[in-house]
From Swiss-Prot:
Keywords: Amino-acid biosynthesis, Aromatic amino acid biosynthesis, Cytoplasm, Transferase. It catalyses: 3-phosphoshikimate + phosphoenolpyruvate = 5-O-(1-carboxyvinyl)-3-phosphoshikimate + phosphate. The gene is aroA. Monomer. 3-phosphoshikimate binds at K22, S23, R27, S170, S171, Q172, S198, D314, N337, K341. This is 3-phosphoshikimate 1-carboxyvinyltransferase.
Length: 426
């Protein structure tokens, strides 16, 4: 087993240019594929999840060219839908941002497509998306367990019409449905069942669709109307913002042990909801400064917060470990969808926080963290989850340091994370 020892860090200072957003990268790759014209994507994330998407697109006959350390991608759009003359099997690892949108996109054309992934992917639900696609005439069948990958699509196109989709589990289901709706054979009217989680991620989807020339009527996130006959048109060039979830670790570092940490690539003009993580740090007492495309965090005495963090579920994980350096008990609420991510993040977070001495109350959809008087060192299991590894790097700011097991799991979104993290201490 690979291990990484992080020795205690007294102070952090510096500037970090955040790699491209995973959410934006994979959405943009798919939209560029379906669009008319050639799109140049810059600051594309170079990571496992993006590689699974790129490999699948290549297998499906899409032409693209990667340059500049895989961060610039020129995609030749197909001006329509994906078809296959022979049956195709696509392996998508544990990349939800590839599995969900491709599942929807492949129903639009003609052909037989089987989508598979790693064992954890077979535990991540997709049933709500498949149910909605079936309402529009899609033929999708499960190969193992109902509601979960692997699955096979016998594609003949989507009919259009009225469709209901559950909104309370993952915003990726709605994102996938929205992106394919303009290419259905008729108008699509989407009604949300239950409360929609992670609304800011839907805003990312709608903003990108608009950049590619497609309009969606958003009725206050209760329903969405998409007119048929719209086409995706390449915007020519598209800059992928830095990943706001990845920015959270460096901003937290600045708040805990700054000095001053500046992250560039995200800021006031960001389309990502996770930039609101900086507002949570400010509520905890950190000194936060905003620019159009940067955020600065400076160290200060931190206090606990009690907040609904449904709108920033990924970045909220960083608050759970930052809470170890705050006075009082921090409550993070309305985060059930942590349980269906790369691992059951609620259970994993509770287990690992207890290892360092925290008092933790783990509920169905919340976690409460009371810091120990003095955290103690531990070997932190990462559950093949990139965010677990990055969150627990915060323990380097305790006097004891920390050991991270299997640190290479950060390759999913931020392959050189620990190099960048350690650079702040030097």
């Amino acid at each position: 087993m690979n291990q990484l020892r992080l020795e205690p860090i007294e102070k952090v200072n510096g500037t970090i240019n955040i790699p491209g957003s995973k959410s934006i990268s994979n959405r943009a790759l798919l939209l560029a594929t379906l669009a008319e014209g050639t799109t140049t994507l810059t600051n594309l994330l170079d990571s496992d999840d993006i590689r699974y998407m790129l490999a699948s697109l290549k297998q499906l006959g899409v032409n693209y060219r990667l340059t500049n350390n895989n961060t610039v991608c020129e995609v030749d759009g197909i001006a329509g839908v994906l078809n296959a003359d022979t049956a195709q099997t696509l392996f998508l690892g544990n990349a939800g941002t590839a599995m969900r949108p491709l599942c929807a996109a492949l129903t639009l054309g003609q052909g037989e497509f089987t989508l598979t992934g790693e064992p954890r992917m077979e535990e991540r639900p997709i049933g709500d998306l498949v149910d909605s696609l079936r309402q529009l005439g899609a033929d999708v069948s499960y190969l193992k367990n109902d509601g979960f990958p692997p699955l096979t699509i016998n594609a003949t196109g989507l009919s259009g019409g009225d469709v209901e989709i559950a909104g309370d589990l993952s915003s990726q289901f709605l994102t996938a449905l929205l992106m394919v709706a303009p290419l259905a054979k008729g108008d699509v009217n989407i009604k949300i069942k239950g409360e929609l989680v992670s609304k800011p991620y839907i805003d990312i989807t709608l903003a990108l669709m608009a950049q590619f020339g497609v309009n969606v009527t958003n009725n206050n996130y209760v329903s969405f109307e998409i007119k048929t006959g719209q086409r995706y048109i390449s915007p020519g060039k598209l800059l992928v913002e830095g990943d706001a979830s990845s920015a959270s670790y460096f901003l937290a570092a600045g708040a805990i042990k700054g000095g001053e940490v500046k992250v560039t690539g995200v800021g006031k003009l960001s389309i990502q909801g996770d930039v609101k993580f900086a507002d949570v740090l400010a509520q905890m007492g950190a000194d936060i400064e905003w620019g159009d495309d940067y955020i600065i965090a400076r160290g200060s005495k931190l206090n606990a917060v009690d907040l609904d963090m449904n709108h920033i579920p990924d970045a909220a994980m960083t608050i759970a470990t930052a809470a170890l350096f705050a006075t009082g008990t921090t409550h993070i609420r309305n985060i059930y969808n942590w349980r269906i991510k790369e691992t059951d993040r609620l259970a994993a977070m509770a287990t690992e926080l207890r290892k360092v001495g925290a008092i933790v109350d783990e509920g169905h959809d919340y976690i409460s963290v009371t810091p120990p008087v003095k955290p103690h060192t531990a070997n932190i299991d990462t559950y093949n989850d990139h965010r677990m590894a990055m969150c627990f790097s915060m323990l380097a700011f305790a006097d004891c340091g920390i050991t991270i097991n299997e640190p290479e799991c950060t390759s999913k979104t931020f392959p050189d994370y620990f190099t960048q993290f350690n650079a702040l201490a030097n």
